[in-house]
């Protein structure tokens, strides 16, 4: 899936990944390739994907058409 992690100042990371781990408001969430569409609120924690780890304060993530877009405050 295509993954974009962005914050107000610009793109943090963009690329292809088979799995992304998100700090969802209701608990840790693992998103795999071809996941069903969703919109989820993120809490303070770490986003992990393709060998990178990004610490965030909060944000939202949405999946559609095998693209995961993550908008965060770091």
Model-found features: residue ranges?
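Compact, glycine-rich, soluble single-domain proteins
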Residues: 2-74
């Amino acid at each position: 899936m295509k993954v974009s992690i962005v914050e107000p100042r610009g793109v943090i990371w963009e690329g292809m990944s088979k799995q992304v781990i998100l700090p969802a408001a209701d608990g840790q969430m693992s998103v795999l390739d071809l996941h069903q569409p969703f919109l989820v609120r993120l809490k303070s924690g770490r986003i992990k994907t393709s060998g990178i780890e990004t610490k965030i304060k909060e944000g939202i993530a949405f999946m559609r058409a095998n693209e995961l877009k993550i908008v965060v405050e770091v």
